[in-house]
Amino acid sequence: MNITHRPVLLAEAVTALISGPLIQEKNAAKKIVVIDGTFGRGGHTQALLKSLEMSARVISFDKDLDAISVAQQIQDPRFTIVHDSFAHMDQYAQAESVDGILLDLGISSPQVDEAHRGFSFRREGPLDMRMNTDQGLTAAEWLEQAPQEEITRVIKTYGEERFAFQIAKAIVAKREEGLSPKTTTELASLVASVVRTREAGQDPATRTFQALRIFINRELEDLELGLKAALKLLKPGARLAVISFHSLEDRIVKQFFQAHAKVEIPRGLPVREKDLPQSALEIIGRVKPSDLEISENPRARSAIMRVAEKRMGAPV
């Protein structure tokens, strides 16, 4: 199995978590618990294990069975791998018991590079796209039965594709001929026949493949649930770092951070500043990859990491 994967913003993500006040606090009796929401190929997890004390514990999650098999090779008693989405991490830890959480929302290089996974329009393979190959419909199965209006909605909403209607119409037309796309290259060719204008440096199929991957794996729904679960699990003073790779993800993270970093007071209500309820989060900042990292790993170019810290006295 190809396990080569270069994690994005590796040093920055680890620093963002371990520089939080809880982990920096020197207390021999305290057992640090950190969650890596997407194990991938273990880059962030391994870096966290190297940076934390021997008494610490790192819990990683992943839906991908290939990632789980890689994780099971790690021989470190401080490490636990969970075959589940980070959306459900609050089922595996108690409220306010975690000292730091990292969510890396990017698809891993092996997932893209291994043709049989069906994520890449550049490699011939079955049109699968499922992170967890034990669950749900493949992209091909869904395209074979979804109404044209639903295909249009998915491609437009999750791919921000302006030719969504034309692409969906072409897919359904092929389906009616008994030629519904079954492979990655069949779908990519079909999209290319419809999308006549291409953005600089971008394949015509890029947005459609992104849309189907996000939809098939419920990525945005998982992100929304995961952010809520993270806020519940973090101790006051603990940090949450989220690395996103496209505007849909980043918008959700940004809006979540902003919504929980301010306190809504009814207009006209006389409240003194010292009596204001405490907001849940303090926004620490955002980080983008350096030019050097992008030159060494072009897949990092669209990444952005946002970091927030749970306030002392914040509501659970």
From Swiss-Prot:
The keyword rRNA processing applies. It catalyses: cytidine(1402) in 16S rRNA + S-adenosyl-L-methionine = N(4)-methylcytidine(1402) in 16S rRNA + S-adenosyl-L-homocysteine + H(+). The keyword rRNA processing applies. Its EC number is 2.1.1.199. Keywords: Cytoplasm, Methyltransferase, rRNA processing, S-adenosyl-L-methionine, Transferase. Transmembrane segments: none annotated. GO terms for molecular function: rRNA (cytosine-N4-)-methyltransferase activity. S-adenosyl-L-methionine binds at G42, G43, H44, D62, F86, D104, Q111. Gene3D superfamilies: Putative methyltransferase TM0872, insert domain, Vaccinia Virus protein VP39. It is found in: Cytoplasm. One of its GO terms (cellular component) is cytoplasm. Its main location: cytoplasm. It holds the Pfam family Methyltransf_5. GO terms for biological process: rRNA base methylation. InterPro entries: RsmH (IPR002903), SAM-dep_MeTrfase_MraW_recog (IPR023397), SAM-dependent_MTases_sf (IPR029063). HAMAP family: 16SrRNA_methyltr_H. Specifically methylates the N4 position of cytidine in position 1402 (C1402) of 16S rRNA. Belongs to the methyltransferase superfamily. RsmH family. This is Ribosomal RNA small subunit methyltransferase H. It comes from Polynucleobacter asymbioticus (strain DSM 18221 / CIP 109841 / QLW-P1DMWA-1) (Polynucleobacter necessarius subsp. asymbioticus). The gene is rsmH.
